[in-house]
Structures are given as structure tokens and as C-alpha cells.
């Protein structure tokens, strides 16, 4: 084309949304009259390209040609003007920032002045694919007044935090239970966090998940007992791995002893398998032998130092500047303390040197002998200065100790040395006491729990950063040459509970503003063990109209012996016994053998016996030889009641 063959013109294609604008930039030294309008070739090429890209957009051609005409009169100027681009470019949708995480710092791990997390760090160690592991996180209010807070769940799809019945205002001393679940998809290291937004300080609870071998159940002490010389005794212990990942182990002899040996000293624990380690003892002498061994199992190591970039994490310049200034202030304070200590030691040395210094001169004798230049150096080493005897003194006089001018410098040096040692001992004791008090405060805060203390000390990477920690693995922001590693705790069954995967519809999210509606409907379902009542056969009449068998069941009335009623007892006051005046109501004899039927409930032990009820009547006394009418009136049981004369 003529447009492409002209070396003084360049064609720029600017694609904006759905339109293609042909921009022509004139770069030449032609006069303004010659550069006033583009040629027909340029306008034809622009129209052809525009029509090919958008055939139905011919209505906007005049606007484009006017734009090309106006912009072509300016050298080195892009055609797409601001008004035209604003009309064509689609506005980006606005995103509402989360006020709980935007420009918020979550750096306090474990506890703050208001809230305390139990445990401070959640570890899911030694997991299996396809299972869901859950732990309970308790957030306690340790302040004297109530508080409100927001719980921000983990951001990765592998962790889930639910709180079905969250309290609005948490009273002092009360706890909020949060169920944290973890569902892995592969064997690797997972990291996330649960963030708690509170009034003054925000709380961070890290979540770690990693494949690791089980906690070694090696005993802390193995006693072989009394063993004869030359005899070998073996003790076997097991290293187990519940996850399908192999782990290397090595047993190191911290305090070796030739009487002990461990086989195998190193090896691999297979996935979902176990390895037996034998410890042999063969005494070589009649003494108590002792050895110390240490078992090291290769696990997952996490970085101890993190390098965060502002672009990926979203660090604020103010936070970075504040951290740098705080670090500089701490370094300056440490340097000032070192300079102060050095200055004190220098002043002390100068004072001691000034005390030993002697100015030699020709002053008149003041009753004490002047020292020479070599004598102060000897005094510093503890030498004894013995003054010379004065002129005219007799040798038979008292010793040097009786001379008032005599000063034993070795005693002074010894006392000064003891005093300095005592002062140093007192100062060291005070410092150790302060450190011990701080350690006791930390242990009391952790409840003297070894597991919590290990969790606090196992991951110092989470205790130093002041940034808003994202929900991604920290290894993403690391440089290998600037990282040192530290192992995580081993697998323990008591740390979490295992249950099968649950449908996602049963979860309740924290951002659900609507009232909670049950997703499960209720209906009566037969158990399958007992058939319904409609399937049973009809009940016979013998079961519908059964006599009351409530007082006695047995063969008391089954034999031919006659039982006489108990004699009445009279009180000293001449009244009749009330218990003798009543008797139970007696029914006719019910013979179950005669009316036996299916499901009638008949009992053969009641054959020939009367059916007794729980109702009572007034006793009717019969004569010694009753008649048939009297017998029928008494009940027809054959029991004779007599009254003594």
C-alpha cells in the first residue's frame, strides 16, 4: 500500500473495547499547510480496516475521521483522545473491600489483652486423604468486662471454621467454641489461619497441616534388670506410621556404652507400617551400666524466617516504616546499654589506677615513708610492703606489726577481691531471679502444659511478623539461602477427632446474614426391628378379659391341703384386730389349661388356684362345718375360718 510505503508515516492500531481506531502520526518537516489534512489514501485505508473489523459501526465513521483529521495536524500525538476513550472503555466494577481485613494487622498469636485462644496453634499432623479432621478452638474473654469480636474463617478451601451458636457479647471468663475442620487432597504442607477482629488488638490463630510420622512411643527409661556376665537381654520397641508416606529415622548414641547396642540404628518407616527396633544389653563387668540414645524421625520442616513482598501480601508502607524504626530504636537502645557498661568499666579502672598512683616529690617527711614508682605495681599484685626500721630504734623492740605505719596490703587486696565476688554473686542472683519470674509468668499463662509450650516454641515464624498474614503457605515468599528450619510436633491422636466427609450444605458460614433455616426435614420412619401394630393378629378374648393376678402367683393353692385363716389377735383394751377383719376379694378359679389358646398368656402354674385382686372386702366368718350355701357365700375356696371359744 501507499500508506505502508511512506517512510514518514506510521500506522498505529488502537483497540479499545469493541472498536478499532486508526491513528496516523505525521513525523516530518513539512510545513503546516502541507500537514493540515491527511491524504485520501490514508482515509481510505482507515475506513477499510474499520469496516472490516466492525461492519455495522459505519455510523461512527465520521466521528473517527474527524478525530483522525484533528489529531493528524499535531506531530507525535496519539489519536485516541480522552473523551473518546472514556466513551468506549467499559468501567471496571467496584469491589467493596472487607473492612475486617483491609488495612488491619493480625500479629498477636495465642493471646491479647482481651482474648486468649486455646490452643494457640492448631496442628493437624499425620493425616489421610479422604478424611475430615476436626479440632475445637476455644476463644476466652480474659478481660474484666464483656467484649464483642468477629471471627474471620480460613481463606483456603482445605480448612473450614464453623461457629453455629456465636454469642453477641462474650461475658468475662466465658469461651466461644469454634470447630475447625481440615480435609486434605494431597500429602503436602498446608497453612492457613483463623483471624479474630477485636476492639484493641487483633488475634491470629495459625493452622498447620503436614504429613508426619506418629509420635514415637519410646520409653524414657529402659531397665534391663540384673543380668549375668556374658548373657544378652533384648528389649523390642516399635516405630509406627499411620500415613502412606515413608519417613527416615536414625538412633543416635548421645552417651555411648559398649555394653549396649541398637539394631537397626537407622532405616525407613514404611507408610502405614511399622519397624521394630531391638535394644541389646550384654554386661561386661559387675557394675551398673548406663547409655543414652536419641531417636530422630525425619518430618516436615517449616521456614523459621519469612521474606514477604509488598506486592503479594499487601504490606503498607507505614507498617514497614514503623517496623524499621522500631528495629532501629531497639538497636540504638542496645548500643547505648553496651556503651554505658563499657564507660562504667573504664571509669572503674581509672579510679582504681588513680588510687594506686603516687606523686613523687621533695615534700617534708610527714611521719610515713613515701612510696617509690615500683611499689604500687607490687601492691596491686598483693606484695607486702615492709617499711625500713627508723633510725635509733632497737632491734629488741616489737615486730613490724606493732609499728603504726605498717599496712598489710595483701589483706586489703584479699578483702577487696572477696567483696567484688560477693557483689557479682548478688547481682547475678538478682538477674537470674528476674528471668526466672518471667519464665514462671509464661508457664503460668500456658497452664504448665508441655504440648502448648512446644507449640508456642515450634513455630517462631508466626511470632515475629507484623503484617496481615494471608491464607497461603509461607514457603511462597521464601528465599532458600535465608531460611533456617525447625521441626513441627509429631502426630498425636488426642489432638483431633476423625469423622467422614460431610456435605457442604450442612455448613453454616459466618457471612450468612439471613436467619438460619434447617436444611433437614423430619418425618417418622419405622425402625424395621418391630413391625407396626397393624400387622399383628387380633387379640383373643382370653387376653382381653384376663383376671387380675396381682397378689400371689404360684402353687400355694395348687395342692389338696386346707389352709386355715390366721387367728384374730385381741389387744389388751378388748378391741378386735383390724387386719383380721378384712380379706381380699376372691374370684372364681381360672383354669388356664381349659382355655388355652394362641397368645392367650396362660400360665400353667396357676392351675387350680384362685385369681386374687387388689380390692378388699369385710371378712365373713363361717362356722366350723359350713353348709353349701355358707360355703358359696364365703367364696367357695375351701378355706374354713373359725372363731375360738
UniProtKB/Swiss-Prot annotation:
Region: Interaction with calmodulin; residue ranges are 428-435
Q: Which GO terms describe its molecular function?
A: calmodulin binding
Q: Kindly report the protein's main subcellular placement as a broad class.
A: cytoplasm
Name the InterPro entries for this protein: CFAP221, Ig-like_fold
Q: Which GO terms describe its cellular component?
A: axonemal central apparatus; axoneme
* Sequence segments annotated as region (Disordered): 381-408
Quote the subunit structure annotation: Interacts with calmodulin; calcium-dependent. Part of the PDCP1 complex composed of CFAP46, CFAP54, CFAP74 and CFAP221; the PDCP1 complex binds calmodulin.
In terms of PANTHER family, this protein maps to: CILIA- AND FLAGELLA-ASSOCIATED PROTEIN 221
Q: Identify this protein by name.
A: Cilia- and flagella-associated protein 221 homolog
Source organism of this protein record: Chlamydomonas reinhardtii (Chlamydomonas smithii)
